[in-house]
Amino acid sequence: EVDAQGMSIPIEMYIMADGRQITNMEVMGMSMSQDAFDGTDVWSTNFMTQSAEKADAEESENKLRGIGEYPSPLLDYADKGYTVELMEDDVVDGVDCYKLKVTKTPLIIEGEEVENVEYYYFDQESYIPLKTESEMRSGPEKGGMMITLYSDYQEVDGMYFPFSLTFKTEDSDGQLIELDTIELNPVVADDFFNFPTEE
C-alpha cells in the first residue's frame, strides 16, 4: 500500500522479466492503472478523466531501452552493455556502504541522447542494496536526484526482497510503499498489461 498525504491506498504491482509492468490501485472506489507498459507503449489512467492515456513516444522508447533490467540492472550487466564502477565508500543512515556507479543505455530527453547513470549503495556486511540514486532528467526538479530507499528485507522463495520502499528527492520526505506480499511467477493473462480499448 501507498501512503499518500496520510491516506493509505492499496495497490498491486506486476513486473515481468520481459519489461511489461502495471500498478493497479483503487482510490475512493475508482479503479485505475499507473506506470503501465505493455511492451510497446507506456500508459496510465488520467486521475481527472478516468480514461487511459498513452505517454509520449519518448517515454515509451526510454522504457524499451530499459527492458532486461528486472530484477536488477547489475544482473549480467556486461551482456546488457552496461558498465559498473566502484566509487568511494559512503554511509547510508549510519551504515557503511559500497557505492557503485552503473552506466546504462542512454535515455532520450527532448530528442537528444543523454547519459543514464544510477548509483547503488550496498551494505558492506550484508551486501543488500539500501539506496539507489539517479538524476531527474525532466520536470520541475530536473537536475535533482531521485532517491529510492530499501528496507524491511524478507525472504521469498529463497530470495530477499525489500518490503518497504521510499521514493524521494533531496528536498522531500518522499512516498512510502509498504508491501504485504510478494508472489513470484504468478500466472498473468497475455493481455493483462495492454492499453484498454473502447468496446
Label each residue range with its predicted role:
Residues 1-2, 9-10, 21-23, 29-31, ...:
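Intrinsically disordered, low-complexity segments enriched in polar/charged residues with Gly/Pro
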Residues 2, 7-11, 48-52, 62-68, ...:
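Generic detector of short, locally flexible boundary/turn motifs and exposed helical patches
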Residues 11, 34, 53-55, 99, ...:
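Short capping micro-motif at the N-terminus of alpha-helices
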Residues 13-20, 38-40, 58-61, 152-154, ...:
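A short, sequence-level motif marking secondary-structure junctions
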Residues 19, 80, 116-118:
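A generic structural signal for short beta-strands and their flanking turns/coil linkers
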Residues 28, 93-195:
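Gly/Pro-enriched, hydrophobic low-complexity segments
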Residues 36, 41-113, 139-142, 188, ...:
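Flexible, processing/modification-adjacent segments and terminal tails
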